[in-house]
From Swiss-Prot:
It holds the Pfam family 5-FTHF_cyc-lig. GO terms for molecular function: RNA binding. This is Methenyltetrahydrofolate synthase domain-containing protein. InterPro entries: FTHF_cligase, FTHF_cligase-like_sf, NagB/RpiA_transferase-like, Nucleotide-bd_a/b_plait_sf, RBD_domain_sf, RRM_dom. Residues 296-369 form the RRM domain. It comes from Mus musculus. The gene is Mthfsd. Residues 246-258 have a biased composition (Basic and acidic residues).
Length: 372
């Protein structure tokens, strides 16, 4: 496909989505509009990955969780390399480490590479983890042979990379690969590329391996002036990073932040995307409204039957939310975490909310709840 001068990122996205649907290139899930599009031949395109020298020397590889990268995730696992997958929309952390069961067959590894497998066979990687990512694999809606990349418009891939820079997981020489259909390789005007946009070094399609030779610098960290207050609310780990950089003396002013009202670094609130009935003044987060005397405790329920206390402690350590004391209630499949204050407890609850151990989604609440 070719693009015309004067187009916008969104017009390029729409043109590619429409083209893939109308030419029967798109694959499940469909329609591909507003997604990183899956396509027929995605597995073949990913098959080029093990032939890259960057893949051979890599020990830890981050691959995005979208459908067209499923075979890439399998190939990483098959090669016995460490696979990191970003958590969807960064809700519960930055990424998870996929941990296949011992002696896993190829069929099991393929299951681990699916979205369900990512949920069932993973452990979270916290900000304090000394992880070093050697290779990054991302999806794209459009990409140019020069290495300019356009995502689906939500900015998560750009933000994921910037956050990895901030935590020291990647550096300016870390190669970035994208896997796309040939029709997604188009001319993109350089004027559309902004400083926070992630560029790519390799493009894998069903028929080609393109080395872009892109010399444009990749993001050197989080550009807080591009981050909205809404995004900060939705992504607890981003708020954690912001507090760290604020303490380091960096300018962390947000795009739409009132000059006289900077968000306090204390209690983290979950996004108000599920209104709660029976409360005054509108919707409330399920993490709000705990009794004062219980505000410094977090109850974690629905723990898998096979979970041991040391496993939960490891997860808490990786998330950077180790409590002062942990009360283990194994027969009830739950644990109570005791923190120094309500701010620490709310931060822990926010990071744990939605997390899975094995096949179980944890139930998290502030205060010692008896009915979980």
């Amino acid at each position: 496909m070719e693009t015309q001068e004067g187009v916008s990122k969104q017009s390029i996205r729409e043109r590619i989505w429409d083209y893939m649907e109308s030419h029967d290139i798109a694959d499940f899930p469909r329609p591909v509009h507003h997604r990183i599009p899956n396509f027929k031949g995605a597995a073949q395109a990913a098959g080029h990955l093990p032939h890259l020298q960057a893949f051979h020397v890599a020990r830890t590889i981050k691959v995005n969780p979208d459908a067209p990268q499923r075979n890439a995730r399998f190939l990483v696992l098959e090669s016995k390399k460490t696979l990191l997958v970003p958590t969807p929309r960064l809700r519960t952390g930055l990424f998870n480490k996929i941990t296949p069961p011992p002696g896993a067959t190829k069929d099991i590894l393929r299951k681990c590479a699916t979205s369900q497998g990512v949920r069932n066979f993973s452990v979270p990687v916290g900000l304090d983890s000394s992880v070093l990512v050697d290779l990054v694999v991302v999806g794209s809606v459009a990409v140019s042979e020069k290495g300019w990349r356009i995502g689906k418009g939500e900015g998560y891939a750009d933000l994921e990379y910037a956050m990895m820079v901030s935590m020291g997981a990647v550096h300016k020489g870390t190669p970035v690969v994208t896997i796309v259909h040939d029709c997604q390789v188009v001319d993109i005007p350089e004027a559309l590329v902004e400083d926070h946009d992630l560029t790519v070094d390799y493009i894998l399609t069903p028929t080609r391996v393109i080395t872009t030779g892109c010399a444009r610098p990749k993001p050197t960290g989080i550009m807080w002036s591009k981050v909205s207050c809404e995004m900060l609310t939705k992504i607890p780990v981003l708020r954690n990073l912001r507090e760290r950089e604020k303490q380091a003396g960096k300018d962390v002013t947000l795009r739409d932040e009132p000059g006289s009202q900077q968000p306090a670094p204390g209690p983290i609130r979950r996004p108000q995307d599920r209104p709660q009935t029976g409360s005054r003044g509108g919707s409330r987060s399920p993490l709000q409204g705990a009794d004062t005397q219980l505000a410094a405790t977090v109850c974690v329920g629905n723990l898998p039957f096979t979970t041991r206390v040391r496993e939960l402690k490891r997860v808490l350590q990786e998330l950077g939310v180790v409590p002062l004391r942990l009360t283990w209630q194994g027969p009830q499949h739950r644990a109570v975490l005791h923190y120094t204050d309500s701010a620490a407890a709310q931060q822990a609850a926010s990071l744990l909310q939605g997390l899975r151990l094995g096949a179980n989604a944890l139930r998290v609440s502030l205060g010692q709840q008896r009915d979980m």
